[in-house]
């Protein structure tokens, strides 16, 4: 009986289930931390970009996310709950900007619609399949950059749960480990594929 790793399809499904589980747990933890600190634990741009992306590829271009077997729709539902809770406490994050404090909830809606238009425009420009990937990459960048910006701008760990959440440490450890391993294997296989070219370059 072939192992999961030797079966590409089974391996792919296993990785998707792992990713789905980790992101879902991350969303649940975000809600828990927001309710606990009464302060958004996810960046403004990040959640708006995510909700917009999930709406576009769950309902407008579902075929582009069909390989997730409905997972995007589940994430969209979870994100809507998260957005409602985050928006509820959003004014607490804007005491230094009275105008934003007053219209924070409206801003969440407006920015989400703006990102939605952007995702749709990109999909129409390069196609839903590529749009799904590149828009998803943008979501990942805003999530990583947004979390850092929140921490630096606030100068406080309120709203952030890295110290108290073992799952966060696991996520950081596994992603950094995999990112560190990737270039090692990349250059290893590159050396095997192009030994002659590499040796010629060294001679030159």
Curated annotation (Swiss-Prot):
- Which InterPro entries is this protein grouped with? PaxB-like
- What is the deletion mutant like? Impairs the synthesis of terretonin but accumulates dimethylorsellinate through the decomposition of an unstable intermediate.
EC number(s)? 4.2.3.-
Class of the enzyme per the UniProt entry, highest EC level: lyase
* Bilayer topology: Multi-pass membrane protein
What's a single GO CC term here? membrane
Q: Which residues cross the membrane?
A: 44-64, 67-87, 103-122, 132-154, 169-189
Recall the GO molecular function terms of this protein's record: lyase activity
Q: Name one GO biological process term.
A: terpenoid biosynthetic process
Q: What does this protein do?
A: Terpene cyclase; part of the gene cluster that mediates the biosynthesis of terretonin, a fungal meroterpenoid that acts as a mycotoxin. The first step of the pathway is the synthesis of 3,5-dimethylorsellinic acid (DMOA) by the polyketide synthase trt4. DMOA is then prenylated into farnesyl-DMOA by the polyprenyl transferase trt2. Methylation by the methyltransferase trt5 then leads to farnesyl-DMOA methyl ester which is further subject to epoxidation by the FAD-dependent monooxygenase trt8 to yield epoxyfarnesyl-DMOA methyl ester.
User: Which protein family is it in?
Assistant: Belongs to the paxB family.
Task: Give the protein name, as stated in the record.
Answer: Terpene cyclase trt1
Organism of derivation = Aspergillus terreus (strain NIH 2624 / FGSC A1156)
């Amino acid at each position: 009986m072939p192992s999961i790793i030797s079966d590409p399809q089974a391996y792919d499904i296993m990785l998707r289930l792992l990713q789905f589980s980790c992101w879902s747990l991350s969303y649940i933890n975000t809600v828990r931390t927001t309710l606990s600190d009464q302060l958004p634990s996810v960046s403004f741009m990040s959640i708006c970009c995510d909700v917009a992306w999930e709406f576009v590829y769950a309902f407008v271009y579902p075929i582009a996310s069909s390989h997730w077997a409905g997972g995007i729709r589940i994430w969209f539902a979870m994100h809507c709950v998260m957005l409602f809770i985050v928006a509820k406490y959003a004014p607490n994050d804007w005491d230094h900007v009275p105008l934003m404090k007053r219209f924070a909830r409206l801003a969440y809606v407006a920015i989400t619609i703006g990102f939605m238009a952007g995702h749709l425009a990109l999909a129409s420009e390069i196609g839903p399949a590529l749009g799904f990937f590149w828009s998803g990459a943008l979501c990942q960048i805003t999530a990583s950059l947004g979390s850092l910006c929140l921490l630096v701008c606030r100068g406080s760990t309120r709203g952030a749960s890295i110290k108290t959440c073992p799952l966060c440490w696991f996520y950081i450890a596994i992603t950094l480990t995999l990112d560190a391993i990737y270039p090692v294997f990349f250059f290893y296989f590159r050396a095997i594929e192009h030994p002659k070219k590499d040796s010629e370059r060294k001679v030159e």
